[in-house]
Each structure stands twice: as structure tokens, then as C-alpha cells.
Amino acid sequence: MARYRGPRLRIVRRLGELAGLTRKVPKRSYPPGQHGQARKKRSEYALRLEEKQKLRFNYGVSERQLVRYVRKARRVSGSTGQTLLQLLEMRLDNTVFRLGMAPTIPAARQLVNHGHILVNGRNVSIPSYQCRPGDVITVRDNERSRRLVETNLQNPGLANLPSHLELDKSTLTGRVTGIVERQWVALEVNELLVVEYYSRKV
């Protein structure tokens, strides 16, 4: 399944707030569609599917990518759900977003794809690059790149900088100081339901 490129507010109405996907707030609080306002009890499968979709749409990953992350998380000792969230949170596009250098994850992905972002002084144009403690994230030294990021920093997508990141606005430099902790994940999601969803599929 390819990355979603359709109307973002429809997704937010169906799944709830997704800070990584869009900053816009839907006018209607109920899900889209003819029967959006009807309340009916959802099955356990539907609940698991919804939590999985939250991850997919918030982080902008394809179904195939998410399956790979689940497999990778299972190979690590500890909580599979928390490891899965850490893998998604430590992606370069999400890190650029959490630093405030882009208003959304799709916008951060575009900055990375277009070569505006450097990691440890090298051009990294792969949004899925896994950031590690010690990585230094800077903006390419040209006027257009700096102007883009400076504008975004004036109105970041999320107000609070997570504890594993540092930002020097004067030099447009971000540092990864550790691995993200669960309480800093800016998404209301039950990761255990996501793991359960994939338990028979992966």
C-alpha cells in the first residue's frame, strides 16, 4: 500500500488528532461519510486497525514500511510496542519535525528529499534515516534553505521540544542527545493494539 496523498482532514476526522500529518483542525468532529455520525460498537479488529492506521498516517509510512518496523522491533529485547514507536520517532523526517524545522512530517520529508538537511555535515536525503544519539542535524548553508527553516521555526508544529533533542536557533543546529522516551511521543496511540494487529500477519 503506497503512502497516502489524499485529503488529510478526512483522516483526522476518522482517527483523531495527528500532529505529524496536518496542523489543520476539522470543522466536524464526527467521522466522514454517510454514516459518520452513527455510533456503533466496533469490533476488536476494528480497534486494532484504527491504532495501526494512526501510526501509518501520522508518520507517513507505507504498509510495507510499517511491517518492516514491526519485524525490526520484535528482534529487540523489551517492549515491542515501545521499540516500534522509538523506531518511528527517530526517523530523520520526524526528528526534523520535532525540532520545529518543519510544520508537519510531510513538510519535513520534503526538506530532507530536496537536500536542505545535513546530518553530521553530510547531505542525507533519506527521510527514513535512523537518527542516533550524537547526531548533529544542520541546515544546508544556502540562503533558501536557511530562510525556509527560519520561517518554520517561528511557528513550529509542536510547542515542546522532546527531552532527547536540543536546538540552537541562532545556528539552526539540532542535536540528538538520546533515544526518545514514551511520554514524549506526540500521538495518542495504543501501541499494544498495533502489535496485536500484526501478531498473525508478520
Swiss-Prot record:
<comment type="subunit">
    <text>Part of the 30S ribosomal subunit. Contacts protein S5. The interaction surface between S4 and S5 is involved in control of translational fidelity.</text>
</comment>
<dbReference type="GO" id="GO:0003735">
    <property type="term" value="F:structural constituent of ribosome"/>
</dbReference>
<dbReference type="GO" id="GO:0019843">
    <property type="term" value="F:rRNA binding"/>
</dbReference>
<comment type="function">
    <text>With S5 and S12 plays an important role in translational accuracy.</text>
</comment>
<dbReference type="Pfam" id="PF01479">
    <property type="entry name" value="S4"/>
</dbReference>
<dbReference type="GO" id="GO:0015935">
    <property type="term" value="C:small ribosomal subunit"/>
</dbReference>
<dbReference type="InterPro" id="IPR018079">
    <property type="entry name" value="Ribosomal_uS4_CS"/>
</dbReference>
<comment type="function">
    <text>One of the primary rRNA binding proteins, it binds directly to 16S rRNA where it nucleates assembly of the body of the 30S subunit.</text>
</comment>
<dbReference type="GO" id="GO:0006412">
    <property type="term" value="P:translation"/>
</dbReference>
<feature type="domain" description="S4 RNA-binding">
    <location>
        <begin position="90"/>
        <end position="152"/>
    </location>
</feature>
<dbReference type="InterPro" id="IPR002942">
    <property type="entry name" value="S4_RNA-bd"/>
</dbReference>
<keyword id="KW-0699">rRNA-binding</keyword>
<comment type="similarity">
    <text>Belongs to the universal ribosomal protein uS4 family.</text>
</comment>
<dbReference type="InterPro" id="IPR001912">
    <property type="entry name" value="Ribosomal_uS4_N"/>
</dbReference>
<dbReference type="InterPro" id="IPR022801">
    <property type="entry name" value="Ribosomal_uS4"/>
</dbReference>
<dbReference type="InterPro" id="IPR036986">
    <property type="entry name" value="S4_RNA-bd_sf"/>
</dbReference>
<dbReference type="GO" id="GO:0042274">
    <property type="term" value="P:ribosomal small subunit biogenesis"/>
</dbReference>
<keyword id="KW-0687">Ribonucleoprotein</keyword>
<dbReference type="Pfam" id="PF00163">
    <property type="entry name" value="Ribosomal_S4"/>
</dbReference>
<keyword id="KW-0694">RNA-binding</keyword>
<protein>
    <recommendedName>
        <fullName>Small ribosomal subunit protein uS4</fullName>
    </recommendedName>
</protein>
<dbReference type="InterPro" id="IPR005709">
    <property type="entry name" value="Ribosomal_uS4_bac-type"/>
</dbReference>
<keyword id="KW-0689">Ribosomal protein</keyword>
